């Protein structure tokens, strides 16, 4: 159904995009049509402008022609004028009247010439202006035409691309539509199949409910009749019931205890190193015991620190005893974990040790602050360590409180309710994380303190190495506590789910005495079951079982096809059986008819040999009459009925076929068929019994395979959990090593800086000593 919803959503999105593209296509089509109309109007305007341009060109040609004529006329007039002037010079003396006349003509000609020149200039100006206007208009129209042609080409390209895009999208949508239709049809078929399956499952559920109800009634009747003593309501008696043995749970719990033991060993080693190097530091700084006597406070502090192994080592021993008490055969719960009390006592003794050394440690830090060598920054670091040590002791007190609460069910079960022990585990995890954070702060502050102490003028190499050792021990302690905190948080659900036994819903723990009795009863039950245990029969080999499983899977896959083929073949066999019965009856009847015909022939041949010819002639007339009647009687069918059925036959005059013999033959035939069918039925019954036994065996194998599959899945889950846990441990160790390397690199850098400073100081001292020696020599 989710797939159909996704497909419908995709189809709706495609339809929306298609509608958007269609609307855009219509808008673009309108734009293209408008641009085409504009281009057509501009083409018409261009034609009109071309026509006007041609007219102007014609006018200009006519004007140029007229101008040329006028220029020629002016030249002629000038020539005539020059001729007249020459003639006038020659004939000045001849006639003054003619000179006056020529002067008048000359003035007229000059006026006419001046007018023509002015008109020619005006026409030239008009021609130039018209030419410039025509060129400008032509350039504008050409640019507009180019722009319109480019726009039209762009619009045409856009239209082509959109049409291609629309065709592609339409094809895609059609393909998607066909695919969606096919998928919808398949989903409808699947929905029908699912409905049928749900109906079958509901029917099976009803059958199972009815069967379970009947079984419940039977079991209740058996319990009421056969179980006279029922102690399920008494908590005292329930405490003595042996719980179910979960070997996998015991192995996992032992594995977790082993991991916790390794973490505790790491923490114990780090604590021993920390207290030992702290003792060494108290004897070195601020006063070195090798050169001077240290204060009584530090003497007492170092004396107490010297006893740290007496309090720290038992923690490892107590955890080892707890680990050894968790075996595969026992039932490990809080009521039976007696060794947890010993570990709690060892933790209490170590807590007393911490409380004993805490005042001396705080006073020692205060004494360092009061020293003249202590700077302000070093005092600040000492006060931070002062606060951190108080916090560390307080968090250890909280941890001891919760561990002692966990040890109560094995000693005093009334001190803790079953509903509260999960909260105790969560508080232990929180306390471990809090101690990890405090140790991080201690390592940071102590590293800063160590770098500041290296700058003290009286700092020795022994102090530097001691500080490095203390830092490494604090880092290892931080890593160990971080590992056990993450380990506890990762397995908190396992700890809180199944670390108690007893009746469900109970608020109190089982008493230790009852738990001890339960363990004794469990040992007795195990011994009794071992005495009853018989050697198992040889099972199917693993390879053969795998082969049988493959065959079973292949047979289940092809079962439906084979069932259809069997149904079709059964229908064909039934039809063929019917046809066979029909033709066998036809053959029997034909055989009977053949025998009767042969008998008739023999009787007719023996009867007619003794008759004479005269009798034939005499009886000829009567025979003709009888033949007519016999033909009629022969043609009339005779119906015979029996137990088998009805038979219609035509009889002769000579002899009627024996119906009883026919019935006997048919009866014999059916008896033979019945015997054959009974033999086939017996064979089919034996085969069905054999197949039923095989199916039961295969069902048993299938159930065993499912159980093995479940066990393998559980093992796979455990393996994945162990892999994740190992990866977490690897990451934590990697981070711790990286932190250590970074701290060591920082320490080396600081050491190099101090060495360079010391070398520079030595060089300066040497230079000053050389200068002083030279001054002394000069003196």
Swiss-Prot record:
Gene Ontology CC terms, in alphabetical order: early endosome
Comp. bias intervals (Basic and acidic residues): 624-637
Keyword RNA-binding: yes
Keywords: Coiled coil, Endosome, RNA-binding
InterPro entries with a match to the protein in the record: PPP1R21, PPP1R21_C, PPP1R21_N, PPP1R21_six_helix
Coiled coil: 2-212, 556-614, 693-739
Pfam family, one: PPP1R21_C
Record field: compositional bias (Low complexity): 96-105
Protein localization: Early endosome
Annotated segments matching region Disordered: 85-105, 612-637, 760-779
GO molecular function terms noted in the UniProt entry: RNA binding
Functional note: Component of the FERRY complex (Five-subunit Endosomal Rab5 and RNA/ribosome intermediary). The FERRY complex directly interacts with mRNAs and RAB5A, and functions as a RAB5A effector involved in the localization and the distribution of specific mRNAs most likely by mediating their endosomal transport. The complex recruits mRNAs and ribosomes to early endosomes through direct mRNA-interaction. Putative regulator of protein phosphatase 1 (PP1) activity. May play a role in the endosomal sorting process or in endosome maturation pathway.
This protein's domain notes: Coiled-coil domains of PPP1R21 are essential for RNA binding.
Subunit relationships: Component of the FERRY complex.
Protein name as annotated: Protein phosphatase 1 regulatory subunit 21
């Amino acid at each position: 159904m989710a797939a159909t919803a996704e497909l419908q959503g995709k189809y709706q999105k495609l339809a929306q995009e298609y509608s958007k593209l269609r609307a855009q296509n219509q808008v673009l089509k309108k734009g293209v049509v408008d641009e085409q109309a504009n281009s057509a109007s501009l083409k018409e305007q261009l034609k009109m402008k071309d026509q006007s341009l041609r007219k102007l060109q014609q006018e200009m040609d006519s004007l140029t022609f007229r101008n040329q004529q006028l220029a020629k006329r002016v030249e002629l007039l000038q020539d005539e004028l020059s001729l007249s002037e020459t003639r006038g010079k020659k004939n000045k003396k001849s006639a003054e009247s003619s000179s006056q006349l020529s002067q008048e003509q000359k003035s007229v000609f000059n006026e006419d010439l001046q007018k023509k020149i002015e008109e020619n200039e005006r026409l030239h100006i008009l021609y130039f202006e018209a030419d410039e206007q025509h060129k400008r208009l032509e350039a504008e129209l050409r640019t507009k035409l180019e722009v319109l042609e480019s726009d039209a080409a762009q619009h045409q390209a856009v239209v082509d691309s959109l049409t291609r895009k629309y065709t592609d999208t339409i094809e895609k949508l059609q393909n998607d539509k066909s695919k969606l239709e096919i998928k919808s049809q398949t989903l409808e078929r699947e929905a029908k199949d699912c409905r049928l399956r749900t109906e079958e499952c509901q029917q099976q559920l009803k059958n199972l409910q009815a069967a379970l109800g009947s079984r419940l009634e039977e079991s209740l009747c058996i319990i009421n009749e056969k179980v006279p003593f029922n102690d399920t309501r008494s908590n005292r008696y329930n405490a003595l019931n042996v719980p179910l043995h979960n070997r996998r749970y015991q192995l996992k719990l032992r594995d977790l205890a082993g991991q916790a033991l390794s973490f505790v060993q790491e923490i114990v080693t780090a604590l021993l190193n920390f207290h030992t190097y702290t003792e060494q530091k108290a004897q070195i700084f601020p006063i070195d015991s090798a050169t001077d006597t240290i204060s009584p406070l530090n003497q007492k502090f170092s004396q107490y620190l010297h006893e740290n192994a007496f309090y720290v080592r038992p923690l490892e021993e107590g955890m080892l005893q707890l680990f050894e008490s968790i075996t595969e055969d026992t039932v490990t719960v809080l009521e039976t974990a007696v060794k947890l009390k010993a570990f709690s006592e060892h933790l209490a003794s170590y807590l007393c040790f911490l409380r004993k050394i805490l005042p001396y440690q705080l006073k020692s830090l205060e004494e360092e602050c009061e020293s003249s060598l202590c700077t302000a920054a070093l005092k600040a670091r000492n006060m931070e360590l002062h606060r951190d040590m108080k916090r560390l002791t307080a968090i250890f007190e909280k941890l001891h409180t919760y561990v002692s609460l966990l040890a109560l069910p094995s000693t005093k079960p009334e001190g803790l309710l079953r509903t509260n022990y999960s909260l105790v585990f969560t508080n232990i995890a929180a306390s471990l994380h809090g101690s990890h954070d405090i140790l991080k702060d201690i390592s940071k502050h102590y590293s800063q303190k160590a770098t500041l102490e290296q700058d003290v003028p009286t700092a020795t190499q022994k102090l530097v190495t001691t500080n490095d050792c203390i830092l490494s021990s604090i880092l290892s302690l931080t890593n160990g506590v971080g590992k056990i905190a993450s380990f506890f948080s990762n397995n908190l659900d396992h700890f809180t789910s199944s670390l108690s036994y007893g009746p469900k819903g109970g608020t109190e723990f089982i008493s230790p005495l009852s738990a001890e009795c339960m363990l004794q009863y469990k040992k007795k039950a195990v011994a009794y079951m071992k005495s009853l245990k018989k050697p198992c029969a040889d099972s199917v080999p693993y390879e053969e079982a795998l082969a049988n499983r493959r065959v079973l899977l292949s047979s289940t896959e092809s079962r439906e096809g084979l069932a259809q083929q069997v149904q079709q073949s059964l229908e064909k066999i039934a039809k063929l059986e019917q046809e066979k019965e029909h033709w066998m009856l036809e053959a029997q009847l034909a055989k009977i008819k053949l025998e009767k015909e042969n008998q008739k022939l023999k009787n007719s041949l023996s009867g007619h040999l003794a008759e004479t010819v005269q009798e034939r002639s005499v009886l000829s007339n009567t025979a003709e009459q009888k033949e007519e009647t016999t033909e009629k009687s022969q043609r009339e069918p005779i119906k015979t009925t029996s137990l088998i059925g009805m038979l219609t036959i035509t009889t002769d005059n000579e002899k009627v076929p024996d119906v009883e013999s026919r019935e006997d033959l048919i009866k014999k035939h059916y008896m033979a068929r019945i015997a054959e069918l009974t033999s086939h039925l017996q064979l089919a019954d034996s085969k069905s019994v054999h197949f039923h036994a095989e199916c039961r065996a295969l069902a048993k194998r299938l159930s065993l395979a499912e159980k093995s599959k479940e066990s393998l899945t559980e093992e796979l889950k455990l393996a994945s959990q162990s892999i994740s846990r190992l990866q977490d441990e690897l990451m934590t160790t990697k981070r711790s090593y990286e932190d250590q390397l970074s701290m060591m690199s920082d320490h080396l850098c600081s050491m190099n800086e101090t060495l360079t400073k010391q070398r520079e100081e030595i060089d300066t001292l040497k230079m000053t000593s050389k200068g002083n020696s030279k001054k002394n020599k000069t003196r």
